[in-house]
Amino acid sequence: MAEESVPSGSLLSLDPELQKDFQQKVHEIRRKSQVGAVSPGVIYIGHIPRALYEPQLREYFSQFGTVTRLRLSRSKKTGNSKGYAYVEFECDEVAKIVADTMNNYLFCERLLKCEFVPPEKVHPRLFIGCTAKFRKPTKPAVSRYNKRRSEAEQKKMTQRMLSKENKVRKRLAEKGIDYDFPGFAARRERKEPTCDADTSVSSQDPTPVCTPTVLERRKSVRLEQNDEDDDDGEVVLKLPQEDEEVVLKLPLKVTPTAKRQKISKSEKKTKIKKQK
C-alpha cells in the first residue's frame, strides 16, 4: 500500500489509521471558528510524569490547538508537582478531541488520564495566577516559623492548636483508648495533701515554746543530742520544769573549720611551752 501524502503544516494523529478522520474534524473546527465565535474548552490531565512542568506541557499540547491557559497543581510547601493539571483550549471541540486522543496514552512509563471538563463544572477561580512565573519557595517552614505574628494571629493559632488537641482526645475516647499525653494547654500543678497534715503538734519534735500549757504537757520530755566532741558548736536543749526558764547555752566562740587560720609548727611549739 502506498503511503498517503500528508500536506505540510497539518496536524498528525497519534493513530495513523485515523489520520483522515482526524484531519476532517480539525478542518471542520477551523471552518466553524472562521464563521463564528467559539467557546473555550478545559481538559483534566492526570498521572503527569515528574519531568513535565508548565513550559513542557504548553509546548506539547500546543500541537493540537491554541492553548489559552494552563494550570499545573503544585505543593505549597515544596513547590513540586502534584501530578495533575488543567489545560484550556481556545475551542471546546479541540479540547474534546485531545481528551479522547490522549486518554490512556503511555507517556514516560505512565498512562495519562485525560477528561473533558464541562463548562458548568469549571471553577471560576481555577486559572487565577496561571500567567505568573512560578518561583519555588526557599525554606518555607523556617520563614513561616520565624514570622512575627500579631496578637490576633497568635490567639487564632492557639485556638486552632487546642481544637485539634481536643479532637484527638475525643477520637481516642470514642475508640476506648485510655491514653493521656501532655497537651498545649498550661496546667497548674495540684499540691497533694500530706498524710501528716492532721497530726497534732505534740507528735512532732519538741520546740522551745514558752507557754504554760505546752510546758505542762512536756514535763517528762527531754531532748539530748549525744555528740562525739563537746566543742562542736551544737546546741543542747533541755526542757525545764514548771517554774524554770528556758536557757540556750552556746559555745563562746564558734568558728567554722573552713575559716580557721593555719598555724605553723613554730607557733605550735611556743604555745605548748607557754602552757607548761
Swiss-Prot record:
Record SMART domains: RRM
InterPro entries the UniProt entry points to: NIFK_FHA_Ki67-binding (IPR021043), Nucleotide-bd_a/b_plait_sf (IPR012677), RBD_domain_sf (IPR035979), RRM_dom (IPR000504)
Gene encoding the protein: nifk
Gene3D superfamilies registered for this protein in UniProt: 3.30.70.330
Compositionally biased intervals (Polar residues): 197-206
Keyword RNA-binding part of the UniProt annotation: yes
Keyword tRNA processing: no
Entry GO terms, CC: nucleolus
Protein name: MKI67 FHA domain-interacting nucleolar phosphoprotein-like
Gene Ontology molecular function: RNA binding
CDD domains given in the database record: RRM_NIFK_like (cd12307)
Positions of region (Disordered): 190-211, 256-276
UniProt keyword terms in alphabetical order: Nucleus, RNA-binding
Domain RRM: 41-119
